[in-house]
Amino acid sequence: MDPSIPRSTIRCLITVSLLAAICLTPFQAGLAQTSANQSFIRINQLGYKTSDPKVAAAFANAPLAERFSVVEVNSQQTVFEGTARPTIGNWGQFRHHAELDFSSLKKSGTFFLRFNAADSAPFSISANTYHEIADQSLEFMRQQRCGYNPWLDAVCHSFDGRTAYGPLPNGTYLNAAGGWHDAGDLLKYLLTSSNATAQLLLSYQMGESHTIFNDRFNALGQPVSNQTADILDEARWGLDWMLRLHPTPDQLYHQVADDRDHKGWRLPQNETVDYGWGSGSFRVVYFADGKPQGLSKYQSESNGIANLAGRYAAAMALGFQVFSKNADTRDYAHVLLRAGREVYLLGRAKEGVQQGNSYGAPYRYAETTWPDDMEWGAAELFRATGERHYLNDAIRYARIASTESWMGKADAGHYQFYPFMNLGHFRLYSIAPPSIKRLLASYYRDGLEKSLTTGRTNPFNAGVPFIWCSNNLVVALATQAFLYEQMTRDKRYRTFALKQVDWLLGRNPWGTSMITQIPAAGVFPRDVHLMTVAILKRPVKGGIVDGPVYMKIFKSLRGVSISEPDPLAAFQDERAVYHDDIKDYSTNEPTMDGTASAILLWTLKAID
């Protein structure tokens, strides 16, 4: 989101520029070189699952060696030798690239790669590589909570909010407390929170039998167990807020606050913005009327509410599926199901999209897709009720949604194709007749093939366009590939999908994980565009940052800049730039919904 008063601190994360001053982390100090022949090895810093393909990336300005080795850290013995596979293309100033494939190494332990007179950072190989990361990422979600925030041990925005555009007189009080702050700012969106809530519930449902979710925190996010998996506590935080946004069967509200929020850095409990009812007081709550909205000169292009309604129904129906299993939460489950049914009908009555609202800047969530959401909602309602009309609806909406996606495109509007992959196709697949199963698989395959083509345009096989929030696209691409494999048992995309996972965890030009504080001994974003972290100088674990963008996007956005000199200058390219700098909200701002989607990906990898 658009910032206001950023600070100018910058931290160096990786070995950098051959021309500028270099700054090393302890993690990489052993790799320091200063010659023009310097080479770099990029790995998945979290490590590799024993059975997974394992492909590192290496690059340099000079021709690369032919052979590489894998060395065990403890014994210093070489345990694997292989031939480097040259890859076509360049990145920035680097003209020579290769892949180091050690997939056949199945031994558990801690190792490093040796290649071209350089050693990689240590990495692990283990069957349990991904068992903790989903749970660890919940720390970021708790830190984003609005209302009582356990990370801050403080209450914020208890006055949310007063209505706009609804059937009630403008300025009428509506209890919209709770939920999550969207990113580095303090807005709250049903548009993103519905997706986050549903993906958390799906993560729990898919991982429930694999003992990867812990109970270390209570419902308030305090460090006390409560006989409920922490991921369910977090999902319920989202569900409870969503229920407040649907106070009557015919009403749905969709956004709290707007970009008037961007008025200086403060902790959430120290709110100062005036939305017309006094400094730090009530914030506006927008009603979902399916029409263009905007209380100043910038208007959305809304033409319905089915995108919100479909995701809302999916989250509520998933909540019913999970919470109806326990006698203590069965009544709550039926409340969820009733709300899901009601809002789904609102979506059927007003097909189209309700976009996010802006006020003083042209940036908003400009979603244009909705059949995918209605498909997902209908599929989950059928799973919850067994009522055939929901299945018929899901199939109808699936045909309309088809292959519509950002995949294969060089550009797209901000959150135009949202969610970034269609979970409706996956959730419909197992309950659909055979002919529809084949169709759904073909839809997923179409996007994966297009992304494969995109991946061939860069030496790292990143299969996404580097638009704003590209890391969310990477998460979606990998998730779609793993779900396709679950659906069809077709493993042709597995290596490609794992390269996307590896990209997020360090196998990228900048050599950094894109997840805050993960892995603990690795290189990860430190100077993130997040008010709580910046003010308190206290790191938070588990948040996925927006990720690299086209250089032209970075140069075009309002209020974005970096400290100079750029410590990552050697690794920037016209195709993508990334900065671990608080002033760059386009690449280094963690997002709530991106983190929730990543939790589903981490769950899929843990149970794989």
Regions found by a protein language model. Name each.
Residues 32-34:
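Boundary at the C-terminal end of the N-terminal hydrophobic targeting segment
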Residues 219-231:
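Acidic, glycine-anchored loop motifs typical of Ca2+
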